[in-house]
């Protein structure tokens, strides 16, 4: 997941999608599946299709429509696709997925969502043993382990590799004769199974099934591998029982996943409505209107408005054509960029006490600009409510987060942050309130590492200050 320096947000990490169907245009199905997952990655995209003998790969930089100008034309019954934000490895054409390799056991195409915590150690061992790496992605470690495995079948080779890697990984892989889905023993990143009329699909999120009219079947369990071929779907629990410890990323519900998805049985949209309700229960602010930062906290703001009876209003308008900014701006440029993307409506906010909902505050650089804009437009008071607890620790499970010292809540109290962003009041949703919001998931099954530093998979010392370029 990437950090947006203008809007002070962590962004989605990657999206993976796969199809096994002998009766459809597989490349087109993968394309539309990736289109539905575009929110999970906007740096690059790739599609690989196969007939079991040959593989055709199309890939490129940018959004899906920019990256894939022409679909693969190889008649095929299997395909996998990937949209990417760089987590480990720089934003470089050689790091575009899926990764396709031909080796003595056949050919495979691998799409990976997540981040491996032991990639550096494995890569050093493999290089010492003669392996050559072409990219700076941790995902390339996976294909090397598969290729070097002594197991007899491709599926067994994949399981063998999966048992050696640690951290976050949801994989969609095509082999010579099957489509394979693999989820790590903690289930950090989502992966689900769907059914087409005559085949099956795998996806990071259930929302992508709707795009191709596929039927949702179930979620892939932590530590599980599914193998799809002409005989149907087989399931293997590849991980050792003592390794399986469900820890679903709670930020999928707060911000990452699309609102119309269900992640492991929990509606993302309902979760966000509930977060707004819980924010009201914890604050009971007396205000005139409830607002959100467009595209960030809107559903939670609706939940707050419903619970409180305070009217919801759109007091900020977003310029949908402003695009993303990948430069690291100085404060003046950041303020200009925010003002280019957002504009306050004086006739809506003038003289009002505003409850402003956001889903998170990472560095605090943008919140103050928005509060300033609202007050310049005549707002009487601004009460900032955040639908997540304070982010005090970096994530090492598929998110390119800031180093800890750059996280404002790691070095400042809530009162200090309130003063820094010039809000009249500031409240973060408690962990207890968050658990109430994500009510269909047991609290012990959620990962809160970015809030409390409780890492369920050990993080090597060399990665404690960030993992993005650790393999370069």
Question: What are the residue ranges of the model-derived segments?
Answer:
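Generic beta-strand/beta-sheet core signal
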Residues: 111, 174, 182-183, 194, ...
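Secondary-structure transition/capping motifs at alpha-helix termini
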Residues: 131, 151-152, 282-288, 306-313, ...
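PRPP-dependent phosphoribosyltransferase catalytic core
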Residues: 162, 177-178, 213-219, 372-472
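Phosphate/diphosphate-binding loops
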Residues: 160, 208, 215-216, 223-224, ...
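Flexible loop/turn segments at secondary-structure boundaries
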Residues: 26, 87-88, 118, 188-189, ...
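Short, glycine/charge-rich flexible loops or terminal/linker lids adjacent to PRPP-binding catalytic cores
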Residues: 309-355, 365, 392-400
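Conserved short alpha-helical segments that host acidic/polar catalytic motifs at enzyme active sites
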Residues: 1-222, 227-287, 293, 381
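A conserved beta-strand->alpha-helix junction
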Residues: 135, 140-143, 312-323, 420-438
């Amino acid at each position: 997941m990437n950090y947006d320096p203008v809007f002070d947000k962590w962004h989605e990490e990657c999206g993976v999608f796969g199809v096994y169907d002998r009766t459809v245009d597989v490349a087109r199905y993968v394309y539309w599946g990736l289109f539905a997952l575009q929110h999970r990655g906007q740096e690059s995209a790739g599609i690989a299709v196969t007939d079991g003998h040959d593989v055709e790969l199309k890939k490129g930089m940018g959004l899906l429509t920019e990256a894939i100008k022409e679909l693969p034309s190889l008649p095929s019954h299997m395909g996998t696709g990937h949209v990417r934000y760089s987590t480990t490895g720089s934003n470089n054409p050689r790091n575009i997925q899926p990764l396709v390799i031909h080796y003595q056991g056949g050919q495979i195409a691998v799409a990976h969502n997540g981040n491996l915590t032991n990639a550096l150690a494995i890569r050093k061992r493999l290089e010492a043993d003669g392996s050559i790496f072409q990219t700076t992605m941790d995902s390339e470690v996976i294909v090397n382990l598969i290729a070097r495995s002594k197991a007899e079948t491709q599926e067994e080779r994949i399981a063998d590799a999966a048992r050696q890697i640690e951290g976050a990984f949801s994989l969609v892989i095509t082999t010579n004769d099957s489509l394979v889905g693999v989820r790590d023993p903690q289930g950090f990143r989502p992966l689900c199974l769907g059914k087409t009329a005559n085949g099956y699909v795998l996806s990071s999120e259930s929302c992508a099934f709707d795009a191709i009219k596929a039927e949702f079947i179930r979620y892939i369990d932590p530590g599980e591998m599914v193998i799809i071929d002409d005989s149907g779907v087989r399931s293997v629990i590849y991980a050792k029982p003592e390794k399986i410890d469900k820890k679903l990323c709670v930020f999928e519900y707060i911000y990452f996943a699309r609102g119309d998805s269900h992640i492991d049985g929990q509606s993302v949209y309902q979760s966000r409505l509930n977060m707004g309700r819980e924010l009201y229960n914890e604050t009971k602010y007396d205000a005139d209107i409830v607002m959100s930062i467009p595209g960030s906290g809107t559903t939670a703001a609706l939940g707050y408005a419903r619970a409180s009876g305070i009217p919801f209003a759109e007091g900020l308008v977003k310029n949908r054509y402003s695009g993303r900014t990948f430069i690291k701006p100085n404060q003046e440029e950041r303020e200009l960029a925010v003002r280019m993307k957002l504009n306050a409506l004086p006739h809506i906010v003038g003289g009002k006490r505003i409850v402003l909902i956001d889903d998170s505050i990472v560095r605090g650089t943008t919140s103050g600009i928005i509060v300033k804009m609202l007050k310049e437009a005549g707002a009487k008071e601004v009460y900032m409510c955040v639908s997540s607890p304070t982010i005090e620790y970096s994530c090492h499970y598929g998110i390119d987060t800031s180093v800890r010292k750059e996280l404002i809540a790691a070095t400042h109290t809530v009162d200090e942050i309130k003063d820094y962003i010039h809000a009249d009041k500031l409240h973060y949703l408690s962990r207890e309130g968050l658990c109430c919001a994500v009510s269909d998931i047991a609290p012990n099954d959620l990962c809160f590492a970015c809030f409390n530093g409780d890492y369920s998979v050990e993080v090597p010392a060399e990665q404690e200050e960030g993992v993005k370029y650790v393999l370069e």
